[in-house]
A protein has these predicted regions:
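Single conserved hydrophobic/aromatic residue that forms the stacking wall/gate
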Residues: 1-9, 13-14
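Extended boundary segments
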Residues: 11, 15-45, 123-148
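Active-site microenvironments in enzyme catalytic cores
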Residues: 11, 36, 88-96
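Acidic/histidine-enriched ion/cofactor-binding microenvironments in catalytic or ligand-binding pockets
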Residues: 57-89, 164-219, 226
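Conserved, well-structured core segments that form or line functional sites
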Residues: 85-91, 98, 102-178, 184-196
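Short, basic/aromatic-enriched C-terminal tail that caps enzymatic domains
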Residues: 222-235
Length: 235
């Protein structure tokens, strides 16, 4: 199981994501690498999603659909969200990549969003409310001048792609379910440079964008609550 959930294809994306590459190529790399290791790309055909990975560039918050006509260019930031089924279990993780030299503003957004996830991990403790974690994540984002998407959050994961609990990253301390040993869920705040307002593309019904057109960033990990804290299953 542990081997399977780490089959996320991210190292290949790190090596090959550069100006001139299409998001369709990234999809193909991840698909081929996942299958080569005996896994199944979880997003493919999930509720009608047409590709094996989500590629979200700049103002796209999440669920971007890979496209051969979408070519990465210098200064872009992209989130590659890779989910895998292996031996009947699901994993879910994503990373941000800076394409070539990006602006200091985008670079800071990517950095702070990763810090939000690291803070979230540090707050995963058995028998404490899950809202403590979400509150700490939100506080760090706001202190750096950013907003956090409210409508989309983390989720349980394991034998199903999306399970309980729902994980908000705009929450209050001492609220929500207790984190108990054996619980597994994602920490995946979507942090916007501007407003937290978002909308879903009416044509493809998947792509979520910021309402103001400013960039968004997201890192995602799957964590397992243990008796003493947590284990990061995949990043």
């Amino acid at each position: 199981y542990e081997i399977g959930v780490r089959l996320v294809g991210s190292e290949m994306c790190i090596r090959d994501s550069k100006p001139g590459v299409s998001t369709e190529e990234i999809d193909r790399w991840v698909h081929e690498e996942t299958v080569r290791h005996g896994g199944i790309p979880a997003p493919l055909n999930y509720e009608g999603f047409p590709k094996s990975v989500c590629t979200s560039v700049n103002e796209v918050v999440c669920h971007g659909i890979p496209d051969e006509e979408q070519i990465l260019k210098e200064g872009d930031i992209i989130n590659v969200d890779v989910s895998t089924i292996y031996n009947g279990y699901y994993s879910d993780s994503s990373r941000m990549f800076c394409i070539g030299k990006v602006s200091p503003e985008k670079e800071k957004l990517v950095k702070v969003t990763k810090e939000c996830v690291e803070i979230g991990i540090s707050q995963v403790k058995p028998w404490t409310p899950i809202g403590n974690m979400g509150s700490a994540v939100h506080k760090h984002a706001v202190e750096n001048g950013y907003s956090v998407v409210r409508e989309i959050g983390g989720h349980g994961v394991g034998v199903e792609f999306h399970e309980d609990p729902w994980v908000s990253f705009v929450s209050e301390e001492n609220t929500g379910v207790l984190m108990v040993p054996g619980m597994m869920f994602t920490i995946e705040p979507m942090v916007n440079m501007g407003s937290d307002e978002i909308y879903t593309d009416e044509i493809d019904e998947w792509t979520v964008r910021t309402e103001d057109g400013l960039p968004s960033a997201q890192w995602e990990v799957t964590v397992l609550v243990t008796e003493t804290g947590c284990e990061v299953i995949c990043w």
